[in-house]
Amino acid sequence: MPDIVNRKVEHVEIAAFENVDGLSSSTFLNDVILVHQGFPGISFSEINTKTKFFRKEISAPIMVTGMTGGRNELGRINRIIAEVAEKFGIPMGVGSQRVAIEKAEARESFTIVRKVAPTIPIIANLGMPQLVKGYGLKEFQDAIQMIEADAIAVHLNPAQEVFQPEGEPEYQIYALERLRDISKELSVPIIVKESGNGISMETAKLLYSYGIKNFDTSGQGGTNWIAIEMIRDIRRGNWKAESAKNFLDWGVPTAASIIEVRYSIPDAFLVGSGGIRSGLDAAKAIALGADIAGMALPVLKSAIEGKESLEQFFRKIIFELKATMMLTGSKNVEALKRSSIVILGKLKEWAEYRGINLSIYEKVRKRE
């Protein structure tokens, strides 16, 4: 088995310090226009950003999506993120816990999260390829109990696995059968998330047919995991690097993924993530059809700079979210979901070509 601990460290190093954010790709969020209301009818002080994340109330419709863990230095990053997430009352996901299940010495970098964040929703994380390799209920329960998780994310990353030097692109259909059986035995919900390439309506419908109702888009336009693996290939002289260059713009852009999932599964719980870099981006994702917005890379970069930097980052994000709510006349998150939007450009073309009637979608996104 390759040294997945060192691989995780390298992933974080490349993500934080190399040019992989939005490389050769777009979220299409620029094609979403929130309609300005010159007389909002509310005051800034009465705006309520609280919402629900499954059984728990959170202070804002924003979450930290899973990133890292597995070694002491990664545990320190997780600790900072968890402490700040607890202070701001927002959910936090951890990176893949495969390393902690297979290497006991890696567990502390994950368990620290619940120790310093006793009340917020924490989301465990395992990969779909591990289901093919034989993971079952025992491993899922271990991942959940390890951090006293409120939910568990199962990540899809076929594009990353294809170009990874030591990748395991194993996605046979029986993995979904196993996931369906496991979900019936768990006490917490499963969220299926992508890893930077988005969820299409075909994938959403397939997952839904196996009992999955919770999704995280992780669309194209944010952290480019094909680029990360390309850099790792280059460092090793691996011939896959040249091929990876041709796929840097592969995937479903975040805004398109939000529309596709919401349109095909109207009752889904949906995290809109992938290139969310501001409170305005978060508001657009929610108005477009997500329940909450998720972000990872900007949180990681701020956490590396320190706790104060991350606190300032979240203050900025939440202020921008509230500013958008003010300027759209949205007193609360439910009102933001129903706010007026205009869909332009490539996103409109994408939706229409994919057979999505935007007049019908207008009612779907507003949950009417």
Curated annotation (Swiss-Prot):
Disulfide bonds: none annotated. GO terms for biological process: isoprenoid biosynthetic process. Mg(2+) binds at residue 161. Its main location: cytoplasm. Belongs to the IPP isomerase type 2 family. One of its GO terms (cellular component) is cytoplasm. Homooctamer. Dimer of tetramers. This is Isopentenyl-diphosphate delta-isomerase. Substrate binds at residues 7-8, 96-98, 160. Keywords: Cytoplasm, Flavoprotein, FMN, Isomerase, Isoprene biosynthesis, Magnesium, Metal-binding, NADP. FMN binds at residues 65-68, 96, 125, 193, 218, 223, 275-277, 296-297. It is found in: Cytoplasm. GO terms for molecular function: FMN binding; isopentenyl-diphosphate delta-isomerase activity; magnesium ion binding; NADPH binding; oxidoreductase activity. Signal peptide: none annotated. SUPFAM superfamilies: FMN-linked oxidoreductases (SSF51395). Involved in the biosynthesis of isoprenoids. Catalyzes the 1,3-allylic rearrangement of the homoallylic substrate isopentenyl (IPP) to its allylic isomer, dimethylallyl diphosphate (DMAPP). It comes from Saccharolobus solfataricus (strain ATCC 35092 / DSM 1617 / JCM 11322 / P2). Its cofactor is FMN; NADPH; Mg(2+).
